[in-house]
């Protein structure tokens, strides 16, 4: 199966798909799958755009809305993870993954799927140590703080991915694992990015949780982005503890596999040593001319005619189900179970057992991922909103997606967004239905099931009745526009600064008409920085 890997998409879907079409034409081959390593920017409209954590002068609607509205259709199955420049409100509606547009699938906070038998895992976001131990407490409309923390990696997703057994063919992340540069051409990397040297020396370049995942999961391929350069590495694994297992055979216990290895150690002592398992790591650039942003690989897969088979991963579904009680939506730190739990007899190994895998068949008769995408909000209108960069638009309120509602209902897990809203005394909105101003999409799902709310036992909260009035809610909505300061999420680079050195044109204040009375009170402008002669960013 031919798979195209994209670094940072930055909303340039048309250019990416055009590049794939050129490759197919020149090589006379068909690309079966596109994987994107973050900064996808699935902005459906101007409200989504306000939740993206970038300074206002860099906000760009790009082209995703065309695929969301149905004006364009993705020519190849596309799977992506989130980065640090996303329509966070939309992705937060799909914590366990789902379709953001026809033929475009988001993996969720973390996820595992199978395409033609190729097992693909991924984790969204970037690592920031001060948020890693927190729960998923954010919900829209965001504050200046939560607009950024919402895409920071949390310990729960890393913990869940560590429970996987068997072979992982491909792993996707936005960040690089810490220390990955030691396994490639470090000198060449520093010639391209000399400002990486300080972070390398301090151990700050990359994500430490991803380094742990790399050692635990040991995938055949690991693809990343974020640092806007191409870099390859070969990572050997001396201790291959992950025993390959078939989905559903139940032989996934790490303890049993380790004991069997020790039993066979003496009998195989005279045999030649086994080849050391190696992970092939590749980071790619962002979608710009003359940049290495796309790579095509040919990976062995099941021979299937027609469209690729796209399925849930049985082991991952069981892990989600068995760790549902570990979800936290609190802002304070909390800790997950581990081996050193003292006298508390709490389960810490959630690698699925044979019985747990067998019980999954009662809930999922088929692992095929349903094509149940629905448009739930109006898409951007380029004719009516052509001057959008000078418009004042507020953030949207929280929405519940019918895909997540159905998934949570069938699997018996909680939607973290629902929990966060309830924990903060908010009323749950109704599950979004098919957008009324657009035609239904062929193959879309039937009307969503009734909203599944978390049980009182799960929440373990005693919440007062909401005290926010309608007037207060309206006032809050007026203040939902936030002006984000610059934040160094990425290492500063000369080429990045050059590519982003674009300022908004000045906006002149229009004087009142002559008939206006001279005594009109002058009001203070909201978002005054938009009207300044010079930008501070």
UniProtKB/Swiss-Prot annotation:
Residues binding a divalent metal cation 2, per UniProt: 39, 84, 174, 226
Cofactor annotation comment: Binds 2 divalent metal cations per subunit.
GO terms (BP aspect): mRNA splicing, via spliceosome; RNA splicing, via transesterification reactions
Pfam family, one: Metallophos
Record keyword Manganese present: yes
SMART domains given in the database record: DBR1
Region described as Lariat recognition loop: 124-154
Start-end of Low complexity biased regions: 251-260
Activity regulation text: Active in presence of diverse metals including Fe(2+), Zn(2+), Mn(2+). Binds two metal cations in two adjacent alpha and beta metal-binding pockets.
Cofactor names: Fe(2+); Zn(2+); Mn(2+)
Domain of life: Eukaryota
Location of this chain's protein in the cell: Nucleus
A GO cellular component annotation in the UniProt record: nucleus
Residues that coordinate or bind a divalent metal cation 1: 8, 10, 228
Hydrolase recorded as keyword: yes
EC number: 3.1.4.-
Keyword set, alphabetical order: Hydrolase, Iron, Manganese, Metal-binding, mRNA processing, Nucleus, Zinc
PANTHER family xref list: LARIAT DEBRANCHING ENZYME (PTHR12849:SF0), RNA LARIAT DEBRANCHING ENZYME (PTHR12849)
Protein name per the record: Lariat debranching enzyme
Species name: Drosophila pseudoobscura pseudoobscura
Gene expressing this chain: DBR1
